[in-house]
Amino acid sequence: MLDNLKQLHDAIESGLRDRLAGLDRVLAYPEIGKSIETPLVAIELAELEPGHDDGTGRVPLIGRMQARIVVDPLVPGADILVRELSARVLRAVHGETWGLPITPGKQIGSAAEDPFRPDLDTYLVWLVEWVHEFDLGERVEPSSQGREIRWGVYPEIGAEHRGDYVDVAIAEEGHP
């Protein structure tokens, strides 16, 4: 059973870095700014769905992982490089558990060009997707203190109606 999703991300990031010798930029959720260093393998958990119920009362999850292989199109041989790196990522994730209690990685769909990230339009980008099934620990980590959330109903919204808002935390406890 995984303690949390960070454990999964850290293991995949570290495992891919080990298996893709010479490629230092393997990152989970990298900040994509005006420019990025390439080549880059950017990993993320794209989707969670219910897994196969084994009758134990636990709720297994199937996590769909994505790796975007990003290459500068101006580098000589970029078209082959993006495909080569995609094939290496496919080979690395196939059957891999990253040392965790999860099912072996299984590719879904095909590895192909990824036209769906406008922030990466100036790069060559290929997408590799695979799944793992796992149980996630029952303990929920406390979230960091966020901003105050108050609930208002239109049209009584805005600063002039601040006193009419309902404090969400108090409302959840059964108080108006």
Across the structure, where does each feature detected by a protein language model lie?
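Charged, amphipathic alpha-helical segments and their flanking helix caps
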Residues: M1-E31, L48-P176
